[in-house]
Protein backbone atom coordinates (compact mmCIF):
# COMPACT_ATOMS: atom_id res chain seq x y z
CA UNK A 1 0.00 0.00 0.00
CA UNK A 2 2.88 2.35 0.87
CA UNK A 3 4.61 1.67 -2.48
CA UNK A 4 1.36 2.29 -4.36
CA UNK A 5 0.86 5.55 -2.51
CA UNK A 6 4.39 6.78 -3.33
CA UNK A 7 3.98 5.73 -6.97
CA UNK A 8 0.72 7.68 -7.15
CA UNK A 9 2.45 10.74 -5.70
CA UNK A 10 5.25 10.47 -8.29
CA UNK A 11 2.74 10.18 -11.13
CA UNK A 12 0.84 13.13 -9.69
CA UNK A 13 3.97 15.28 -9.75
CA UNK A 14 4.74 14.35 -13.35
CA UNK A 15 1.17 14.96 -14.54
CA UNK A 16 0.61 18.25 -12.72
CA UNK A 17 3.67 20.42 -12.00
CA UNK A 18 1.51 22.91 -10.12
CA UNK A 19 0.05 20.21 -7.88
CA UNK A 20 3.50 18.73 -7.25
CA UNK A 21 4.75 22.11 -6.09
CA UNK A 22 1.73 22.44 -3.84
CA UNK A 23 2.26 18.99 -2.31
CA UNK A 24 5.86 19.87 -1.47
CA UNK A 25 4.71 23.08 0.20
CA UNK A 26 2.22 21.08 2.27
CA UNK A 27 4.96 18.65 3.32
CA UNK A 28 7.14 21.51 4.47
CA UNK A 29 4.18 23.06 6.33
CA UNK A 30 6.34 25.92 7.55
CA UNK A 31 4.53 28.90 6.08
CA UNK A 32 1.35 28.78 8.19
CA UNK A 33 -1.81 30.72 7.37
CA UNK A 34 -0.06 33.43 5.37
CA UNK A 35 1.60 30.74 3.25
CA UNK A 36 -1.77 29.16 2.54
CA UNK A 37 -3.21 32.52 1.52
CA UNK A 38 -0.29 33.11 -0.83
CA UNK A 39 -0.67 29.62 -2.27
CA UNK A 40 -4.41 30.09 -2.81
CA UNK A 41 -3.84 33.48 -4.44
CA UNK A 42 -1.29 31.93 -6.77
CA UNK A 43 -3.68 29.10 -7.64
CA UNK A 44 -6.42 31.62 -8.40
CA UNK A 45 -4.15 33.57 -10.77
CA UNK A 46 -3.21 30.39 -12.62
CA UNK A 47 -6.81 29.19 -12.80
CA UNK A 48 -8.15 32.54 -14.03
CA UNK A 49 -5.40 32.68 -16.66
CA UNK A 50 -6.43 29.21 -17.83
CA UNK A 51 -10.07 30.26 -18.04
CA UNK A 52 -9.13 33.38 -20.00
CA UNK A 53 -7.42 31.27 -22.64
CA UNK A 54 -10.14 28.60 -22.76
CA UNK A 55 -13.08 31.02 -22.84
CA UNK A 56 -11.51 33.63 -25.10
CA UNK A 57 -13.91 32.61 -27.86
CA UNK A 58 -17.35 30.96 -27.52
CA UNK A 59 -17.53 27.24 -28.21
CA UNK A 60 -18.60 26.34 -31.73
CA UNK A 61 -20.63 23.34 -30.52
CA UNK A 62 -20.82 20.87 -27.65
CA UNK A 63 -17.79 18.94 -28.91
CA UNK A 64 -15.69 22.09 -28.83
CA UNK A 65 -16.92 22.84 -25.31
CA UNK A 66 -16.14 19.28 -24.21
CA UNK A 67 -12.61 19.59 -25.55
CA UNK A 68 -12.10 22.77 -23.51
CA UNK A 69 -13.17 21.00 -20.33
CA UNK A 70 -10.89 18.09 -21.15
CA UNK A 71 -7.97 20.55 -21.35
CA UNK A 72 -8.97 22.09 -18.01
CA UNK A 73 -9.27 18.67 -16.34
CA UNK A 74 -5.94 17.54 -17.74
CA UNK A 75 -4.19 20.67 -16.44
CA UNK A 76 -4.49 19.39 -12.87
CA UNK A 77 -5.39 22.82 -11.52
CA UNK A 78 -8.37 21.18 -9.87
CA UNK A 79 -8.26 17.59 -8.66
CA UNK A 80 -11.27 15.39 -8.04
CA UNK A 81 -9.99 14.94 -4.48
CA UNK A 82 -10.33 18.70 -3.90
CA UNK A 83 -14.03 17.99 -3.32
CA UNK A 84 -13.14 16.57 0.09
CA UNK A 85 -9.59 17.77 0.68
CA UNK A 86 -10.05 21.38 -0.42
CA UNK A 87 -13.77 21.92 -1.17
CA UNK A 88 -13.46 25.73 -0.99
CA UNK A 89 -11.35 25.52 -4.13
CA UNK A 90 -14.08 23.65 -6.01
CA UNK A 91 -16.71 26.25 -5.08
CA UNK A 92 -14.39 29.14 -6.00
CA UNK A 93 -13.48 27.48 -9.31
CA UNK A 94 -17.17 27.18 -10.16
CA UNK A 95 -17.98 30.79 -9.22
CA UNK A 96 -15.09 32.10 -11.30
CA UNK A 97 -16.26 29.98 -14.20
CA UNK A 98 -19.79 31.44 -14.02
CA UNK A 99 -18.35 34.98 -14.00
CA UNK A 100 -15.89 34.38 -16.82
CA UNK A 101 -18.38 32.58 -19.03
CA UNK A 102 -21.32 34.91 -18.39
CA UNK A 103 -21.66 36.20 -21.96
CA UNK A 104 -21.14 32.74 -23.47
CA UNK A 105 -23.94 31.03 -21.58
CA UNK A 106 -24.19 28.44 -18.81
CA UNK A 107 -23.25 25.27 -20.70
CA UNK A 108 -19.60 25.12 -19.70
CA UNK A 109 -20.21 25.75 -15.99
CA UNK A 110 -22.87 22.99 -15.89
CA UNK A 111 -20.45 20.65 -17.67
CA UNK A 112 -17.83 21.50 -15.04
CA UNK A 113 -20.06 20.63 -12.04
CA UNK A 114 -21.18 17.37 -13.65
CA UNK A 115 -17.58 16.31 -14.26
CA UNK A 116 -16.24 17.13 -10.82
CA UNK A 117 -19.15 16.91 -8.40
CA UNK A 118 -21.60 14.36 -9.82
CA UNK A 119 -19.25 12.05 -11.72
CA UNK A 120 -16.02 12.33 -9.74
CA UNK A 121 -17.69 13.12 -6.41
CA UNK A 122 -19.92 10.04 -6.52
CA UNK A 123 -16.90 7.82 -7.13
CA UNK A 124 -15.14 9.44 -4.18
CA UNK A 125 -18.22 8.88 -2.00
CA UNK A 126 -19.12 5.31 -3.03
CA UNK A 127 -16.00 3.90 -4.68
CA UNK A 128 -13.38 1.59 -3.15
CA UNK A 129 -9.72 2.58 -2.92
CA UNK A 130 -8.80 1.18 -6.33
CA UNK A 131 -11.69 2.99 -8.00
CA UNK A 132 -10.71 6.25 -6.35
CA UNK A 133 -7.09 5.84 -7.44
CA UNK A 134 -8.27 5.27 -11.02
CA UNK A 135 -9.89 8.71 -10.90
CA UNK A 136 -6.38 10.14 -11.03
CA UNK A 137 -5.76 8.36 -14.33
CA UNK A 138 -9.06 9.70 -15.64
CA UNK A 139 -7.90 13.21 -14.76
CA UNK A 140 -4.49 12.73 -16.37
CA UNK A 141 -6.06 11.60 -19.63
CA UNK A 142 -8.59 14.42 -19.57
CA UNK A 143 -11.46 11.96 -19.82
CA UNK A 144 -15.00 13.22 -19.30
CA UNK A 145 -17.74 11.49 -17.36
CA UNK A 146 -21.47 11.82 -16.86
CA UNK A 147 -23.94 11.00 -14.10
CA UNK A 148 -26.90 8.92 -15.33
CA UNK A 149 -29.61 9.16 -12.67
CA UNK A 150 -32.75 10.84 -14.07
CA UNK A 151 -35.17 8.61 -15.98
CA UNK A 152 -38.03 9.55 -18.27
CA UNK A 153 -40.81 8.31 -15.98
CA UNK A 154 -39.22 9.60 -12.77
CA UNK A 155 -38.92 13.24 -13.80
CA UNK A 156 -38.22 15.33 -10.70
CA UNK A 157 -38.46 12.21 -8.52
CA UNK A 158 -34.96 11.14 -9.54
CA UNK A 159 -33.65 8.46 -7.21
CA UNK A 160 -37.10 7.73 -5.82
CA UNK A 161 -38.12 6.04 -9.06
CA UNK A 162 -35.40 3.94 -10.74
CA UNK A 163 -36.37 1.29 -13.30
CA UNK A 164 -32.97 0.60 -14.88
CA UNK A 165 -31.76 -2.77 -13.56
CA UNK A 166 -28.34 -4.32 -13.03
CA UNK A 167 -28.62 -8.06 -12.35
CA UNK A 168 -25.78 -10.16 -10.91
CA UNK A 169 -25.09 -13.58 -12.44
CA UNK A 170 -23.15 -15.81 -10.08
CA UNK A 171 -22.47 -18.25 -12.89
CA UNK A 172 -20.98 -15.61 -15.19
CA UNK A 173 -19.57 -13.47 -12.36
CA UNK A 174 -20.93 -10.46 -14.24
CA UNK A 175 -23.71 -7.90 -14.14
CA UNK A 176 -26.25 -7.28 -16.89
CA UNK A 177 -27.26 -3.60 -17.16
CA UNK A 178 -30.62 -3.15 -18.84
CA UNK A 179 -33.09 -0.41 -19.74
CA UNK A 180 -36.37 -2.38 -19.53
CA UNK A 181 -38.58 0.19 -21.27
CA UNK A 182 -38.58 3.63 -22.83
CA UNK A 183 -39.82 5.06 -19.52
CA UNK A 184 -36.61 3.78 -17.90
CA UNK A 185 -34.43 5.58 -20.46
CA UNK A 186 -31.92 7.92 -18.81
CA UNK A 187 -32.75 11.47 -19.92
CA UNK A 188 -31.24 14.95 -19.73
CA UNK A 189 -27.84 13.47 -18.97
CA UNK A 190 -25.40 16.37 -19.19
CA UNK A 191 -22.22 15.45 -21.10
CA UNK A 192 -23.89 12.19 -22.13
CA UNK A 193 -22.93 12.39 -25.81
CA UNK A 194 -19.20 12.83 -25.20
CA UNK A 195 -18.58 10.96 -21.94
CA UNK A 196 -15.97 8.22 -21.89
CA UNK A 197 -17.36 6.86 -18.62
CA UNK A 198 -20.68 7.12 -16.82
CA UNK A 199 -21.79 6.66 -13.25
CA UNK A 200 -25.11 4.88 -13.79
CA UNK A 201 -27.72 4.50 -11.06
CA UNK A 202 -29.61 1.21 -11.36
CA UNK A 203 -31.55 -1.21 -9.19
CA UNK A 204 -29.20 -3.99 -8.03
CA UNK A 205 -30.78 -7.45 -8.41
CA UNK A 206 -29.06 -10.33 -6.60
CA UNK A 207 -30.63 -13.82 -6.44
CA UNK A 208 -33.92 -12.35 -7.58
CA UNK A 209 -34.02 -9.79 -4.79
CA UNK A 210 -34.01 -6.04 -5.43
CA UNK A 211 -31.49 -4.26 -3.17
CA UNK A 212 -32.39 -0.76 -4.35
CA UNK A 213 -30.45 1.83 -6.36
CA UNK A 214 -26.68 1.37 -6.57
CA UNK A 215 -24.01 3.16 -8.59
CA UNK A 216 -22.08 1.47 -11.40
CA UNK A 217 -19.09 2.81 -13.30
CA UNK A 218 -19.74 2.04 -16.96
CA UNK A 219 -17.26 2.41 -19.81
CA UNK A 220 -19.19 4.19 -22.55
CA UNK A 221 -16.18 4.00 -24.87
CA UNK A 222 -12.85 2.22 -24.89
CA UNK A 223 -11.05 5.53 -25.25
CA UNK A 224 -11.80 9.24 -25.33
CA UNK A 225 -13.63 10.29 -28.51
CA UNK A 226 -13.86 6.65 -29.61
CA UNK A 227 -17.04 4.85 -30.77
CA UNK A 228 -19.64 3.76 -28.23
CA UNK A 229 -19.28 0.29 -26.76
CA UNK A 230 -21.75 -2.37 -27.98
CA UNK A 231 -25.38 -2.28 -26.78
CA UNK A 232 -25.18 1.33 -25.60
CA UNK A 233 -27.36 3.87 -27.39
CA UNK A 234 -27.35 7.64 -26.93
CA UNK A 235 -29.25 10.50 -28.52
CA UNK A 236 -29.57 14.26 -28.26
CA UNK A 237 -32.47 15.65 -26.19
CA UNK A 238 -32.76 18.51 -28.71
CA UNK A 239 -31.98 22.22 -29.03
CA UNK A 240 -32.46 24.37 -25.95
CA UNK A 241 -33.15 28.08 -25.47
CA UNK A 242 -29.64 28.48 -24.03
CA UNK A 243 -26.63 26.35 -23.16
CA UNK A 244 -26.41 24.50 -26.47
CA UNK A 245 -22.66 24.18 -25.98
CA UNK A 246 -23.64 21.47 -23.47
CA UNK A 247 -24.82 18.10 -24.75
CA UNK A 248 -27.87 16.69 -22.96
CA UNK A 249 -28.44 13.07 -23.90
CA UNK A 250 -30.81 10.18 -23.48
CA UNK A 251 -29.08 6.84 -22.85
CA UNK A 252 -30.27 3.23 -23.19
CA UNK A 253 -28.51 0.03 -22.14
CA UNK A 254 -29.45 -3.15 -24.00
CA UNK A 255 -28.19 -5.95 -21.71
CA UNK A 256 -24.70 -4.50 -21.33
CA UNK A 257 -22.33 -6.92 -19.58
CA UNK A 258 -20.30 -5.42 -16.74
CA UNK A 259 -17.51 -6.88 -14.59
CA UNK A 260 -17.88 -6.91 -10.80
CA UNK A 261 -15.37 -4.04 -10.60
CA UNK A 262 -17.97 -1.71 -12.13
CA UNK A 263 -19.99 -1.69 -8.89
CA UNK A 264 -19.02 1.20 -6.60
CA UNK A 265 -18.85 -1.05 -3.54
CA UNK A 266 -17.24 0.91 -0.72
CA UNK A 267 -20.29 0.34 1.49
CA UNK A 268 -22.28 -2.49 -0.13
CA UNK A 269 -21.25 -5.25 -2.49
CA UNK A 270 -21.42 -8.92 -3.43
CA UNK A 271 -19.38 -11.85 -2.14
CA UNK A 272 -18.24 -13.21 -5.51
CA UNK A 273 -17.50 -16.64 -3.93
CA UNK A 274 -21.06 -17.18 -2.71
CA UNK A 275 -23.04 -14.64 -4.71
CA UNK A 276 -24.51 -13.14 -1.53
CA UNK A 277 -25.21 -9.45 -1.08
CA UNK A 278 -23.07 -8.03 1.74
CA UNK A 279 -22.95 -4.77 3.67
CA UNK A 280 -19.48 -3.53 4.47
CA UNK A 281 -18.12 -1.13 7.10
CA UNK A 282 -20.02 -2.80 9.94
CA UNK A 283 -17.79 -0.92 12.37
CA UNK A 284 -19.59 2.31 11.47
CA UNK A 285 -22.17 3.81 13.79
CA UNK A 286 -25.78 2.65 13.64
CA UNK A 287 -26.98 5.75 11.78
CA UNK A 288 -24.18 5.47 9.21
CA UNK A 289 -24.82 1.77 8.60
CA UNK A 290 -28.48 2.36 7.87
CA UNK A 291 -27.74 4.91 5.14
CA UNK A 292 -28.62 3.76 1.63
CA UNK A 293 -26.44 4.48 -1.38
CA UNK A 294 -28.99 7.11 -2.44
CA UNK A 295 -28.55 8.74 0.97
CA UNK A 296 -24.82 8.88 0.36
CA UNK A 297 -25.29 10.21 -3.16
CA UNK A 298 -27.31 12.93 -1.46
CA UNK A 299 -24.03 14.31 -0.13
CA UNK A 300 -23.15 15.13 -3.72
CA UNK A 301 -26.53 16.76 -4.17
CA UNK A 302 -25.85 19.00 -1.15
CA UNK A 303 -22.60 20.15 -2.74
CA UNK A 304 -24.40 20.55 -6.05
CA UNK A 305 -27.23 22.57 -4.51
CA UNK A 306 -24.78 25.04 -3.02
CA UNK A 307 -23.00 25.28 -6.39
CA UNK A 308 -26.34 25.83 -8.16
CA UNK A 309 -27.34 28.52 -5.64
CA UNK A 310 -23.98 30.25 -6.09
CA UNK A 311 -24.23 29.93 -9.88
CA UNK A 312 -27.69 31.54 -10.01
CA UNK A 313 -26.59 34.25 -7.58
CA UNK A 314 -23.41 35.02 -9.53
CA UNK A 315 -25.37 35.13 -12.79
CA UNK A 316 -27.86 37.70 -11.55
CA UNK A 317 -25.09 39.75 -9.86
CA UNK A 318 -23.20 39.87 -13.14
CA UNK A 319 -26.40 40.68 -15.07
CA UNK A 320 -27.26 43.58 -12.75
CA UNK A 321 -23.67 44.87 -12.78
CA UNK A 322 -23.51 44.91 -16.58
CA UNK A 323 -27.02 46.34 -16.99
CA UNK A 324 -26.34 49.11 -14.47
CA UNK A 325 -23.14 50.03 -16.30
CA UNK A 326 -25.23 50.43 -19.45
CA UNK A 327 -27.99 52.35 -17.63
CA UNK A 328 -25.45 54.70 -16.00
CA UNK A 329 -24.25 55.94 -19.40
CA UNK A 330 -27.59 55.78 -21.21
CA UNK A 331 -28.97 59.33 -21.44
CA UNK A 332 -32.63 60.13 -21.02
CA UNK A 333 -34.19 63.37 -22.28
CA UNK A 334 -36.69 66.01 -21.24
CA UNK A 335 -38.84 68.42 -23.30
CA UNK A 336 -38.39 72.17 -23.00
CA UNK A 337 -40.84 74.22 -25.13
CA UNK A 338 -39.15 76.79 -27.38
CA UNK A 339 -41.33 79.74 -26.38
CA UNK A 340 -43.32 80.69 -23.35
CA UNK A 341 -46.50 80.91 -25.36
CA UNK A 342 -46.25 77.27 -26.32
CA UNK A 343 -48.57 75.89 -23.69
CA UNK A 344 -50.05 72.62 -24.93
CA UNK A 345 -47.45 72.17 -27.68
CA UNK A 346 -46.43 68.79 -26.30
CA UNK A 347 -50.06 67.67 -26.39
CA UNK A 348 -50.15 68.83 -30.00
CA UNK A 349 -47.08 66.70 -30.80
CA UNK A 350 -48.77 63.70 -29.22
CA UNK A 351 -51.90 64.32 -31.31
CA UNK A 352 -49.76 64.38 -34.45
CA UNK A 353 -48.09 61.10 -33.49
CA UNK A 354 -51.47 59.47 -32.89
CA UNK A 355 -52.77 60.80 -36.22
CA UNK A 356 -49.83 59.32 -38.10
CA UNK A 357 -50.30 55.96 -36.43
CA UNK A 358 -53.98 56.02 -37.47
CA UNK A 359 -53.04 56.88 -41.07
CA UNK A 360 -50.56 54.00 -41.27
CA UNK A 361 -53.10 51.63 -39.76
CA UNK A 362 -55.63 52.44 -42.50
CA UNK A 363 -53.18 52.25 -45.37
CA UNK A 364 -52.15 55.90 -45.41
CA UNK A 365 -55.15 57.03 -47.51
CA UNK A 366 -56.12 59.73 -45.03
CA UNK A 367 -53.70 62.67 -44.85
CA UNK A 368 -53.01 64.32 -41.52
CA UNK A 369 -54.39 67.83 -41.10
CA UNK A 370 -50.96 68.77 -39.80
CA UNK A 371 -49.45 67.89 -43.20
CA UNK A 372 -46.52 65.92 -41.76
CA UNK A 373 -45.26 62.38 -41.92
CA UNK A 374 -42.97 62.31 -38.91
CA UNK A 375 -44.07 62.89 -35.35
CA UNK A 376 -40.41 63.00 -34.37
CA UNK A 377 -39.74 65.85 -36.84
CA UNK A 378 -42.71 67.87 -35.58
CA UNK A 379 -41.73 67.26 -31.97
CA UNK A 380 -38.23 68.53 -32.77
CA UNK A 381 -39.70 71.70 -34.30
CA UNK A 382 -41.97 72.34 -31.34
CA UNK A 383 -39.60 71.60 -28.52
CA UNK A 384 -35.89 71.49 -27.79
CA UNK A 385 -34.06 68.47 -26.42
CA UNK A 386 -32.74 68.82 -22.88
CA UNK A 387 -30.41 66.23 -21.39
CA UNK A 388 -32.01 64.41 -18.47
CA UNK A 389 -30.63 62.06 -15.82
CA UNK A 390 -29.13 58.69 -16.86
CA UNK A 391 -31.49 55.75 -17.26
CA UNK A 392 -30.28 54.26 -13.96
CA UNK A 393 -31.83 57.24 -12.13
CA UNK A 394 -35.32 56.70 -13.48
CA UNK A 395 -37.24 56.15 -10.21
CA UNK A 396 -38.46 52.59 -10.72
CA UNK A 397 -35.10 51.37 -12.06
CA UNK A 398 -33.17 53.19 -9.35
CA UNK A 399 -35.35 51.49 -6.73
CA UNK A 400 -34.85 48.09 -8.36
CA UNK A 401 -31.06 48.47 -8.31
CA UNK A 402 -31.27 49.42 -4.63
CA UNK A 403 -33.47 46.44 -3.70
CA UNK A 404 -31.28 44.06 -5.70
CA UNK A 405 -28.14 45.31 -3.95
CA UNK A 406 -29.68 44.84 -0.52
CA UNK A 407 -30.77 41.29 -1.35
CA UNK A 408 -27.39 40.59 -2.92
CA UNK A 409 -25.49 41.53 0.23
CA UNK A 410 -27.75 39.40 2.43
CA UNK A 411 -27.49 36.38 0.13
CA UNK A 412 -23.72 36.84 -0.24
CA UNK A 413 -23.29 36.57 3.53
CA UNK A 414 -25.62 33.58 3.78
CA UNK A 415 -23.97 31.61 0.96
CA UNK A 416 -20.53 32.22 2.48
CA UNK A 417 -21.77 30.80 5.80
CA UNK A 418 -23.42 27.77 4.21
CA UNK A 419 -20.36 27.00 2.08
CA UNK A 420 -18.09 27.29 5.12
CA UNK A 421 -20.18 24.86 7.20
CA UNK A 422 -20.53 22.40 4.32
CA UNK A 423 -16.78 22.48 3.67
CA UNK A 424 -16.13 21.60 7.32
CA UNK A 425 -18.52 18.66 6.98
CA UNK A 426 -16.89 17.51 3.73
CA UNK A 427 -13.39 17.69 5.16
CA UNK A 428 -14.37 15.67 8.21
CA UNK A 429 -16.34 13.26 5.99
CA UNK A 430 -19.35 13.74 8.24
CA UNK A 431 -23.02 13.64 7.36
CA UNK A 432 -24.54 17.09 7.02
CA UNK A 433 -26.58 18.09 10.09
CA UNK A 434 -30.33 18.73 9.85
CA UNK A 435 -29.68 22.44 10.32
CA UNK A 436 -27.17 22.46 7.46
CA UNK A 437 -29.45 20.44 5.17
CA UNK A 438 -32.25 22.97 5.75
CA UNK A 439 -29.87 25.88 5.14
CA UNK A 440 -28.69 24.32 1.87
CA UNK A 441 -32.31 23.90 0.79
CA UNK A 442 -33.05 27.54 1.70
CA UNK A 443 -30.01 28.67 -0.30
CA UNK A 444 -31.09 26.67 -3.36
CA UNK A 445 -34.70 27.90 -3.14
CA UNK A 446 -34.13 31.59 -2.47
CA UNK A 447 -30.96 32.28 -4.48
CA UNK A 448 -32.65 30.88 -7.58
CA UNK A 449 -36.15 32.30 -7.01
CA UNK A 450 -34.83 35.77 -6.19
CA UNK A 451 -32.60 35.69 -9.27
CA UNK A 452 -35.57 34.74 -11.49
CA UNK A 453 -37.76 37.45 -9.97
CA UNK A 454 -35.17 40.23 -10.11
CA UNK A 455 -34.06 39.34 -13.63
CA UNK A 456 -37.67 39.45 -14.85
CA UNK A 457 -38.23 42.84 -13.21
CA UNK A 458 -35.00 44.20 -14.66
CA UNK A 459 -36.01 43.06 -18.14
CA UNK A 460 -39.23 45.08 -17.87
CA UNK A 461 -37.38 48.34 -17.20
CA UNK A 462 -34.53 48.31 -19.72
CA UNK A 463 -36.35 48.38 -23.05
CA UNK A 464 -34.65 47.07 -26.17
CA UNK A 465 -31.39 46.52 -24.30
CA UNK A 466 -32.89 43.39 -22.71
CA UNK A 467 -33.63 42.01 -26.20
CA UNK A 468 -30.04 42.25 -27.42
CA UNK A 469 -27.45 39.49 -27.63
CA UNK A 470 -24.35 39.63 -25.41
CA UNK A 471 -26.22 41.39 -22.59
CA UNK A 472 -26.78 38.24 -20.55
CA UNK A 473 -30.56 38.40 -20.82
CA UNK A 474 -30.47 35.88 -23.66
CA UNK A 475 -29.14 33.29 -21.19
CA UNK A 476 -31.62 33.98 -18.39
CA UNK A 477 -33.31 30.60 -18.94
CA UNK A 478 -30.24 29.24 -17.15
CA UNK A 479 -32.05 30.28 -13.97
CA UNK A 480 -34.97 27.99 -14.85
CA UNK A 481 -32.44 25.19 -15.24
CA UNK A 482 -31.12 26.03 -11.77
CA UNK A 483 -34.63 25.72 -10.35
CA UNK A 484 -34.93 22.08 -11.39
CA UNK A 485 -31.29 20.96 -11.08
CA UNK A 486 -29.89 19.09 -8.06
CA UNK A 487 -33.33 18.69 -6.50
CA UNK A 488 -36.43 20.49 -7.79
CA UNK A 489 -36.93 23.66 -5.74
CA UNK A 490 -40.66 22.94 -5.48
CA UNK A 491 -39.92 19.53 -3.94
CA UNK A 492 -37.50 21.16 -1.49
CA UNK A 493 -40.15 23.73 -0.56
CA UNK A 494 -42.74 21.04 0.13
CA UNK A 495 -40.27 19.11 2.27
CA UNK A 496 -39.46 22.25 4.24
CA UNK A 497 -43.18 22.89 4.82
CA UNK A 498 -43.85 19.28 5.84
CA UNK A 499 -40.94 19.34 8.28
CA UNK A 500 -42.27 22.54 9.87
CA UNK A 501 -45.74 21.01 10.23
CA UNK A 502 -44.30 17.83 11.72
CA UNK A 503 -41.87 19.54 14.12
CA UNK A 504 -42.14 23.12 15.28
CA UNK A 505 -39.04 25.22 14.71
CA UNK A 506 -37.65 26.08 18.20
CA UNK A 507 -36.54 29.50 16.86
CA UNK A 508 -39.87 30.16 15.18
CA UNK A 509 -40.69 33.80 14.48
CA UNK A 510 -44.18 35.28 14.37
CA UNK A 511 -44.70 35.22 10.56
CA UNK A 512 -43.63 31.57 10.45
CA UNK A 513 -45.92 30.68 13.38
CA UNK A 514 -48.92 32.29 11.68
CA UNK A 515 -48.22 30.55 8.35
CA UNK A 516 -47.64 27.17 10.03
CA UNK A 517 -50.84 27.32 12.09
CA UNK A 518 -52.82 28.43 9.03
CA UNK A 519 -51.60 25.41 7.08
CA UNK A 520 -52.24 22.99 9.97
CA UNK A 521 -55.78 24.31 10.47
CA UNK A 522 -56.49 23.91 6.77
CA UNK A 523 -55.17 20.35 6.70
CA UNK A 524 -57.23 19.40 9.75
CA UNK A 525 -60.38 20.94 8.29
CA UNK A 526 -59.92 19.01 5.05
CA UNK A 527 -59.36 15.73 6.90
CA UNK A 528 -62.44 16.38 9.05
CA UNK A 529 -64.42 16.43 5.80
CA UNK A 530 -63.13 12.97 4.92
CA UNK A 531 -60.25 14.03 2.68
CA UNK A 532 -57.04 11.96 2.76
CA UNK A 533 -53.88 13.66 4.01
CA UNK A 534 -52.36 13.45 0.51
CA UNK A 535 -55.35 15.20 -1.05
CA UNK A 536 -55.38 17.75 1.76
CA UNK A 537 -51.74 18.65 1.04
CA UNK A 538 -52.54 19.03 -2.66
CA UNK A 539 -55.46 21.28 -1.85
CA UNK A 540 -53.36 23.44 0.51
CA UNK A 541 -50.46 23.91 -1.88
CA UNK A 542 -50.61 27.71 -1.66
CA UNK A 543 -50.36 27.67 2.13
CA UNK A 544 -47.54 25.10 1.92
CA UNK A 545 -45.43 27.20 -0.45
CA UNK A 546 -46.14 30.31 1.60
CA UNK A 547 -44.89 28.60 4.77
CA UNK A 548 -41.83 27.27 2.93
CA UNK A 549 -40.79 30.71 1.69
CA UNK A 550 -41.26 32.30 5.12
CA UNK A 551 -39.30 29.46 6.75
CA UNK A 552 -36.50 29.72 4.17
CA UNK A 553 -36.14 33.48 4.68
CA UNK A 554 -36.13 32.95 8.46
CA UNK A 555 -33.28 30.46 8.03
CA UNK A 556 -31.28 33.07 6.10
CA UNK A 557 -31.86 35.68 8.83
CA UNK A 558 -31.01 33.23 11.63
CA UNK A 559 -27.78 32.11 9.99
CA UNK A 560 -26.66 35.65 9.21
CA UNK A 561 -27.41 36.80 12.76
CA UNK A 562 -25.52 33.82 14.17
CA UNK A 563 -22.54 34.55 11.92
CA UNK A 564 -22.55 38.21 13.01
CA UNK A 565 -22.62 37.15 16.67
CA UNK A 566 -19.70 34.75 16.14
CA UNK A 567 -17.74 37.46 14.33
CA UNK A 568 -18.35 39.96 17.14
CA UNK A 569 -17.29 37.40 19.73
CA UNK A 570 -14.07 36.72 17.82
CA UNK A 571 -13.30 40.44 17.69
CA UNK A 572 -13.83 40.78 21.45
CA UNK A 573 -11.59 37.79 22.15
CA UNK A 574 -8.89 39.14 19.84
CA UNK A 575 -8.89 42.45 21.74
CA UNK A 576 -8.59 40.62 25.06
Predicted regions and their residues:
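A glycine-rich, basic-preceded beta-loop-alpha segment at the flavin cofactor/substrate interface
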Residues: 188-189, 226, 250-304, 322-351, ...
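Amphipathic, small/basic residue-rich leader segments at the start of a protein or domain
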Residues: 10-146, 156, 170-176, 349-352, ...
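A short core secondary-structure module
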Residues: 170, 174-233, 250
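Flexible, small-/acidic-enriched active-site or ligand-binding loops
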Residues: 227-256
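Sensory/regulatory domains in signal-transduction proteins
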Residues: 122, 184-186, 484
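Alpha-helix capping/hinge segments and adjacent helical runs
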Residues: 434-511
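Ordered core of a single globular domain
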Residues: 455, 473, 489-565
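Extended, well-ordered alpha-helical scaffold/bundle regions in very large, multi-domain proteins
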Residues: 342, 346-348, 355, 381-425, ...
Amino acid sequence: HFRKKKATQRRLKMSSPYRAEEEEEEDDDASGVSGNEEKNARWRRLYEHKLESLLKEPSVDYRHSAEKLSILVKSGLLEFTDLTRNPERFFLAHRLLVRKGFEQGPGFSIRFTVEYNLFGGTILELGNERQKLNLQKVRERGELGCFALTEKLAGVNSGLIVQTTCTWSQREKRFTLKTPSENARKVWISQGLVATRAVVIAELIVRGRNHGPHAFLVNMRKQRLGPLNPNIKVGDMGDKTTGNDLDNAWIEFDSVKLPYSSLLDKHDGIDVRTGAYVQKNTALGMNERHLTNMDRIGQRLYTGRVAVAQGAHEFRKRLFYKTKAFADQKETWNFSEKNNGGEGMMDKAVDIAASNVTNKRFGGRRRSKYNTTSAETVATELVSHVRGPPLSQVPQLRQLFLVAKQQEMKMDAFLVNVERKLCISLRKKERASKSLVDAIAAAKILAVEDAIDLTHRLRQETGSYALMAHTGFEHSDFLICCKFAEGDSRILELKLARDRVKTKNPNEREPERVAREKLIEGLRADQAQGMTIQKAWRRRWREAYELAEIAARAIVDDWNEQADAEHNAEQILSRL
